[in-house]
């Protein structure tokens, strides 16, 4: 699992106490390390939808997108983590759309933390422990699962942070 801090004003406003504003899962594609994540506003081609995407880890962490970042490992058997990564890749291949309503109850569309929580819950691992953050900003009210909520999870071990 990877987290990063970008400069998205909505993410920073929503997660002002959090250290990170985005999250993805590391997967292997041939000999390359990639990150699968759900993201709006980063089309790969003209007319591309906001959706789950897969990109090289270097692109995910490039300075234009990330001011800081971390690589964390889920405290689970490696077969569980590999299966979660395969599930994330499958969502990418299905071209699952980005969830602009941030609805955790609807898995037909995904936002970044929802994607990670979803693939690990299918493996019977509850990373967030049900932790949600209450957000009350104009036009955006409710309880949401933010990267900062997951960053605090006892089920994660820090591997590297910058």
What spans do the regions from the language model cover?
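N-terminal targeting signals for Sec/Tat export/insertion, comprising classic cleavable signal peptides
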Residues: 1-4, 153-155
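Glycine-rich catalytic cores of cysteine/serine-nucleophile enzymes that process amide/ester linkages
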Residues: 2-73, 97-107
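Sec-exported extracytoplasmic/periplasmic mature domains
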Residues: 28, 40, 76, 89-93, ...
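Residue-level detector of flexible, active-site-proximal loop/helix-junction positions
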Residues: 42, 78, 134
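Short beta-strand-to-coil "C-cap" segments at the C-terminal boundary of structured domains/repeats
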Residues: 73-76, 162
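Stable alpha-helical elements in mature extracytoplasmic
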Residues: 80-88, 108, 112-115
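Membrane-interfacial terminal anchoring regions of lipid-handling membrane enzymes
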Residues: 81, 91, 95-96
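Activation targets extended, charge/polar-rich intrinsically disordered C-terminal tails
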Residues: 100-162
């Amino acid at each position: 699992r990877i987290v990063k801090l970008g400069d998205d004003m909505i993410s920073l406003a929503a997660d002002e106490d959090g250290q990170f504003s985005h999250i993805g899962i590391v997967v292997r594609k041939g000999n390359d390390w990639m990150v699968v994540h759900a993201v709006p506003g980063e089309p790969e081609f003209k007319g591309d939808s906001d959706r789950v995407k897969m990109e090289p880890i270097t692109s995910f962490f490039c300075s234009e997108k990330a001011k800081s970042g971390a690589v964390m490992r889920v405290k689970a058997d490696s077969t569980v983590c590999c299966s979660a990564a395969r599930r994330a890749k499958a969502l990418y291949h299905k071209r699952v759309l980005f969830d602009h309503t941030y609805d955790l109850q609807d898995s037909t569309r995904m936002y970044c933390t929802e994607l990670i929580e979803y693939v690990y819950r299918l493996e019977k691992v509850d990373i967030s422990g049900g932790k949600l953050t209450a957000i009350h900003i104009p036009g955006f009210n409710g309880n949401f699962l933010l990267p900062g909520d997951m960053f605090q999870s006892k089920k994660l071990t820090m591997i590297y942070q910058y």
